[in-house]
Amino acid sequence: MDSRIVMFAGSQGGHYVELMGLKDLFGKYDSILVTDNLKATFDKPELQVFKSIEYSSAMVKCRERKAGSSKKQSRIAAVTSYLKMFQECWNICKKWNPRVIVTTGSYIAVPLFLCGKIHGAKTIFIESNAKVYKKTLTGILVEHISDKIYVQWPEMLKLYSQAEYYGPLI
């Protein structure tokens, strides 16, 4: 595949909205979108620049509970969903062989970064705009495998020693 492929990944909701803050970059590369947001289609003008949109169905199942429900997923079901997500990420990385993976989180970041690293990709993590004084769990897990970390609040520079701050995405 093309060696200029940049993969942009984000879970539905706020992570996806923040990822769309990078829309000016999408058309500058052969870009692939990885998401669980089924509303992300080529019908949306800002997404027409993507070479492909890859959906992670396992990412949806990995969520502990659905919005408004207090019922939690069993640990076995959560691990099974996460292993399926890792397999999906492996297949996506193998298919596209991205040079760079950029994510705003959440669920997809860890398996996608691990698979991307094995395939030789550089990784960029953008910490959530919702976090001002504390790292996200995703940030904690990907901090040491990220080639670059960007934070959206200057206060976060104290928590991430190698991070860079350029302001908020949205």
Describe every region a protein language model picked out.
Residues 5, 30-33, 122, 147-148:
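Residues at the starts of beta-strands that form the adenosine-phosphate
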